[in-house]
Amino acid sequence: MQSGNKFTTFWFNGQKYLSQDMEFTIFDLLNYFDYNPSLLVVEYNNSILIKKNWNKIVILNNDKIEVLTIVGGG
């Protein structure tokens, strides 16, 4: 019997990532990369996500996540 290694390939801000044997949410990913959630807009598979759903959506194989940072200026 082969080991149960499960790989998930996903795209984050245009870069390809590979995760092994780990399930994580959009919120987990943002924390890992040290983003400040109060200043972000997240696009998930070409749709803008509501912030309250970031902790509910588990990243799946071939998902595409883009993070837009809001900055002030004049």
For each of these PLM feature ranges, what is it?
Residues M1-G73:
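Ubiquitin-like/PB1-type beta-grasp interaction modules and other compact soluble beta-rich domains
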